[in-house]
């Protein structure tokens, strides 16, 4: 192991330290100074402290030349820096939305939680885990970060103590998560047995030699990460978790967690076991992780999009939609080129932006008693601003130009087509396009309720927190801006 520069290590981990200090400060302030204060006051102060911690972490991000410490335990480069910036921005958005919604509910917040400080501290702890997860190439630290992040997400899912659905969803999430952790740890132990190292670079050297044990290890790792990204058939936790968790907890799971999980999954496959990729092309099929991922992608696209057609709950619709999007994202891994990795990251960033915005709108709607498709009738007349935001987010998820979701799909599908000779992945791209058409149908079904179906005669205008409304409008504007200038983000990922 190379000598450790502790000053350099401290400098590179300052964002995580800032978030950790902010989390403990939020807990101490809420628990000791504000426990008897009105819930609205506690929510606003916890939100401000969390926002301050996130902004300090953003300012301390080490955007420097590529650096590697502790033999791959801490690896930072330009691409990792972009991922960390995105994760912190999503944390900021969730914090602003949560604080404003909780503050508006005031004493009625018991419908969600009275543990204000704990909620915001957990968001910050989850972000710390995600930042460590995307900045390491050591399998042991990857496993520890994944499981710490998962543990926080289990708690966030169960945070509504007054909801049996929340507790049931968290239990299912925990049980499936524990099983997936076992698969992932077993796979990591086999990779260590094959290579004698936990560093992805060293594993890559050992993986260049054919070994049946290596293929077993790869299958187990795919099983473990398949759960984290909610890909079929490892998706069974997702619909219940998305439906039972508090709206903004579900939004955080669907956005930040998915960004971090896909990035580290790509790192493991592209760096550690790239030589065992095989081939998923229709005319050049060869054993490896590519054909396995191709089967998972097909199942995810079919099951996710077809099941979403039958949903009447907005949350479950977004959950099955997430499964379908996981199938599209796997195309970026199957293509296995630098262009496909950039397209995958672009897609997962823009998907996370849109789905977090959709859950933000849903959080406000649920405070007004709207939680199903039928109750959306006439929403455009009751709240034009929220309806416009929902329109932008859903059409971006559907991939409609000129929104950013269209360019994300275009670049991802184009990278998949160019990856294999003779358009070997054309069959997967055609299926993805067909399933995108199916997805458009159920997104338009939601928008039909919002804009076409008349509202009930006794319906009243919706109340929505000003800060939450501004946050959602900024996110919708960003979705439009990135669609009008798609290279604005892509140039940082190439």
Curated annotation (Swiss-Prot):
A single Gene Ontology MF term assigned here is: NADH dehydrogenase (ubiquinone) activity
Organism domain of life: Bacteria
UniProt-listed InterPro entries? NADH-Q_OxRdtase_suN/2, ND/Mrp_TM
Q: Where is the signal peptide, in residue numbers?
A: none
Q: Which residues cross the membrane?
A: 14-34, 45-65, 82-102, 116-136, 139-159, 174-194, 214-234, 262-282, 289-309, 317-337, 344-364, 388-408, 422-442, 470-490
Note the SS bond partners: none
GO terms for biological process, alphabetical: ATP synthesis coupled electron transport
Q: Which GO terms describe its cellular component?
A: plasma membrane
Subunit structure of this chain's protein: NDH-1 is composed of 14 different subunits. Subunits NuoA, H, J, K, L, M, N constitute the membrane sector of the complex.
This protein is called NADH-quinone oxidoreductase subunit N 2
Gene (UniProt):
nuoN2
């Amino acid at each position: 192991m190379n000598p450790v520069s502790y000053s350099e290590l401290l400098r590179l981990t300052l964002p995580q330290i800032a978030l950790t200090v902010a989390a403990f400060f939020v807990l101490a302030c809420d628990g000791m100074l504000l426990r008897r204060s009105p819930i609205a006051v506690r929510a606003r102060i916890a939100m401000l402290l969390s926002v301050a911690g996130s902004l300090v972490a953003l300012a301390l991000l080490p955007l420097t030349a590529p650096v590697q410490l502790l033999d791959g335990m801490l690896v930072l480069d330009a691409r990792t820096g972009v991922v960390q910036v995105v994760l912190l921005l999503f944390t900021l958005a969730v914090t602003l939305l949560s604080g404003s919604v909780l503050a508006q509910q005031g004493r009625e917040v018991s419908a969600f939680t009275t543990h204000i400080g704990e909620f915001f501290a957990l968001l910050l702890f989850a972000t710390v885990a995600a930042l460590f997860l995307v900045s390491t190439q050591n399998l042991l630290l990857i496993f520890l970060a994944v499981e710490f992040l998962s543990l926080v997400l289990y708690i966030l899912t169960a945070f509504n103590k007054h909801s049996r659905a929340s507790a049931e969803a968290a239990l299912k999430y925990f049980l499936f998560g524990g099983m997936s952790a076992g698969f992932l740890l077993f796979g990591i132990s086999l990779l260590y047995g094959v290579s004698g190292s936990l560093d992805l670079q060293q594993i890559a050297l050992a993986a260049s030699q054919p070994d049946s044990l290596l293929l077993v290890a790869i299958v187990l790792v795919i099983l473990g990460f398949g759960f984290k990204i909610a890909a079929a058939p490892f998706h069974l936790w997702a619909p219940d978790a998305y439906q039972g968790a508090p709206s903004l907890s579900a939004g955080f799971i669907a956005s930040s967690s998915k960004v971090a999980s896909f990035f580290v999954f790509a790192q493991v496959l592209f760096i550690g076991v790239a030589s065992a990729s095989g081939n998923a092309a229709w005319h050049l099929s060869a054993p490896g992780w590519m054909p396995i991922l191709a089967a998972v992608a097909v199942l995810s696209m079919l099951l996710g999009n077809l099941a979403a057609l039958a949903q009447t709950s907005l949350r479950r619709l977004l959950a099955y939609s997430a499964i379908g999007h996981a199938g599209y994202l796997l195309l970026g891994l199957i293509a296995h080129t630098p262009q496909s990795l950039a397209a995958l990251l672009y897609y997962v960033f823009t998907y996370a932006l849109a789905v977090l915005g959709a859950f933000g709108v849903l959080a406000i709607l649920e405070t007004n008693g709207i939680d199903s498709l039928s109750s959306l009738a006439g929403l455009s007349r009751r709240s034009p601003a929220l309806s416009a935001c929902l329109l932008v987010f859903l059409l971006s998820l559907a991939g409609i130009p000129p929104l950013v979701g269209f360019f994300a799909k275009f670049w991802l599908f184009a990278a998949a087509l160019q990856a294999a000779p003779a358009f070997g992945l054309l069959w997967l791209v055609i299926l993805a396009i067909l399933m995108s058409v199916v997805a458009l149908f159920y997104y338009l079904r939601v928008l039909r309720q919002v804009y076409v179906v008349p509202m009930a005669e006794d319906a009243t205008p919706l109340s929505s927190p000003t800060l939450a409304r501004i946050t959602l409008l900024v996110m919708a504007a960003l979705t439009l801006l990135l669609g009008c200038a798609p290279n604005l983000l892509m140039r940082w990922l190439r």
